[in-house]
Structure formats: structure tokens, C-alpha cells
């Protein structure tokens, strides 16, 4: 199987939500460096649900294999990604193995946790998320419509990948605006609102319990650039399995990343 790393850099903004930009001369709004290839990004959205104190602290990462080829030097930790990779189009079978990081004691061996087969087409983009928990992992494959939005606009997609959260609404507020605007409502676990257009800006975003004003989590200064495509998703546990022991990064939070980014300068 032939594969190549894709030059398009998905700008991951998963933990701190501070945007890492490309060089200002690199106009990432133009796709096509890997013509006639299918492009796939893997995102680890799978927290550790262990209830035993020692096990609850462990960060258990995942190795993705593509048609039996594994070319990541390190496993992908929650809630990170390995970026888009380019492959010959056709049938893609992805296998996923857990791999415990060096922080774990004992480190343990890798173990298969799942497999996913889907068809790919040339010049199309796909996202694969591991969801659920490390103890019961599921996989979601999404087709990524990375066509450019209307000039001056941006596109966003919204997902609920928090395994224990009830249905959620997503609201945004720009600048000093006093009234939040609902972008998605009643998103159940694994629910997706596919790409749609919004105005670019610097937003406060918040997930609320569906149909209420109860805010589960909010993030400020979320940068949405024009002519770009973003995914926004709920992650982690609303109620951590082992209070006081569960690794802090597994608590409910908001992630977003740019599937396609255009330099606004």
C-alpha cells in the first residue's frame, strides 16, 4: 500500500485552544498537494474510565494501523490527533491498538481494541474518532466536506463525544455581545451537526445541558478564521469515574481543531 504524509496541516487546538498557525506565506486554504489520494485523520477521543485509583491515573494512548501499516512513532494520546495522512483510494481497514505511555506503571503491552473498514475515494477527506472509553472503545468515521465556505465565512462541525454526558446544546458569544447564539441543539452522545457556515471571529463557546441554561463547560477566545473549516467537540467525563484519582485531562472539556485552515493575513 502506498501512503504519504499530507502537507495540509490540521491545526490542532485540543488542550489549550491556542491556535498554532502556519507560516504566513503558506496559504493553507488551497488543497491538492496530494492529488488523487484519500486523506484520513485519526483523533483519540477515548478517556480512561478506570475506577481503581492507580489505574485511573494512566494515560492510555492508541496506535492506528492503516491496512496493517503503522507508521506513527508514538501512540496518539487523548485528546490528540496524528494529522491527515494520504493513501491510495479504495478499501481502508483501520486497526486500533492501545499502548500505555511511559507514565504508566507497569507499562504493559499493546492490545487490539477495535477495527473499522470503510471505502475511500480520491481527493476526499475522512475523520476517524475513537470514542467511548478505553475499557469499551467505539469508532466513528465521518466524511469531511472541506470545500471552501462562502468568501469571508468559516465552516464548523459540532460533535458530542462525552461518553456520559446527556444531550447538549452549543452556544457561542462573540466579543461583547450579550446574547449567546445557539449553533447546535439536543446533540446526544455521538451526535453530529455537520459542517455549516458562520462568521469568523473570536468567540466564547459553551456546552449546555440541552434545553436549559446550565453550562457544563465554556471556553473563551476561541479563534475561528475566515475561509477555514473547524470541528468542535465535547470530550471527557461529566462525572469522573474515580473522583480525586482520575487523570485531570479526562474531565469534561471542549476541543476544536482546524480541518482546513486559511491564513487570514
Which residues make up each language-model segment?
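C-terminal motif of bacterial Sec signal peptides marking the signal peptidase cleavage site
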Residues: 17-21
Amino acid at each position: 500500500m502506498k501512503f504519504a504524509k499530507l502537507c495540509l496541516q490540521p491545526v490542532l487546538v485540543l488542550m489549550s485552544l491556542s491556535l498554532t498557525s502556519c507560516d504566513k506565506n503558506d496559504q493553507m486554504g488551497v488543497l491538492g498537494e496530494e492529488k488523487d489520494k484519500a486523506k484520513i485523520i485519526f483523533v483519540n477521543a477515548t478517556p480512561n474510565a478506570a475506577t481503581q485509583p492507580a489505574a485511573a491515573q494512566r494515560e492510555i494512548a492508541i496506535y492506528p494501523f492503516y491496512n496493517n501499516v503503522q507508521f506513527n512513532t508514538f501512540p496518539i494520546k487523548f485528546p490528540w490527533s496524528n494529522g491527515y495522512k494520504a493513501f491510495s483510494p479504495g478499501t481502508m481497514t483501520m486497526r486500533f491498538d492501545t499502548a500505555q505511555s511511559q507514565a504508566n506503571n507497569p507499562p504493559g503491552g499493546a492490545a487490539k481494541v477495535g477495527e473499522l473498514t470503510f471505502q475511500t475515494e480520491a481527493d476526499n477527506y475522512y475523520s476517524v474518532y475513537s470514542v467511548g472509553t478505553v475499557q469499551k472503545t467505539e469508532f466513528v468515521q465521518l466524511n469531511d466536506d472541506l470545500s471552501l465556505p462562502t468568501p469571508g465565512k468559516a465552516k464548523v462541525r459540532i460533535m458530542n463525544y462525552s461518553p456520559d454526558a446527556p444531550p447538549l446544546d452549543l452556544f457561542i458569544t462573540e466579543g461583547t455581545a450579550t446574547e449567546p447564539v445557539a449553533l447546535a441543539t439536543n446533540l446526544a452522545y455521538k451526535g453530529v451537526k455537520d459542517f455549516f457556515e458562520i462568521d469568523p471571529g473570536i468567540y466564547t463557546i459553551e456546552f449546555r445541558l440541552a434545553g436549559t441554561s446550565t453550562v457544563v463547560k465554556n471556553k473563551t477566545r476561541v479563534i475561528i478564521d475566515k475561509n477555514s473549516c473547524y470541528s468542535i467537540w465535547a470530550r471527557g467525563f461529566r462525572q469522573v469515574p474515580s473522583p480525586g484519582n482520575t487523570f485531570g485531562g479526562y474531565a469534561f472539556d471542549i476541543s476544536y481543531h482546524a480541518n482546513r485552515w486559511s491564513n487570514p493575513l
